[in-house]
Amino acid sequence: MADESKFEQVKGNVKETAGNVMDNKDLEQEGKEDKASGKAKEVTENAKDKVNDFIDKLKK
């Protein structure tokens, strides 16, 4: 899953840069949204991992 969120961030960065270079504000905005979505997924995944690690420690 972490790879998916990183890929989404990279894809967003490419779109944002392309939109900026081509002066395409819609593409640039779409890229920003993809980056933000990917980052949010990454943060959620990290939080889930930490909770699961904590639960595993409690079970021991």
Curated annotation (Swiss-Prot):
Domain of life: Bacteria
Region Disordered, annotated ranges: 1-60
Basic and acidic residues composition bias: residue spans: 23-60
Pfam families cross-referenced by the UniProt entry: CsbD
Protein family: Belongs to the UPF0337 (CsbD) family.
Protein name, UniProt field: UPF0337 protein SSP1897
Species annotation: Staphylococcus saprophyticus subsp. saprophyticus (strain ATCC 15305 / DSM 20229 / NCIMB 8711 / NCTC 7292 / S-41)
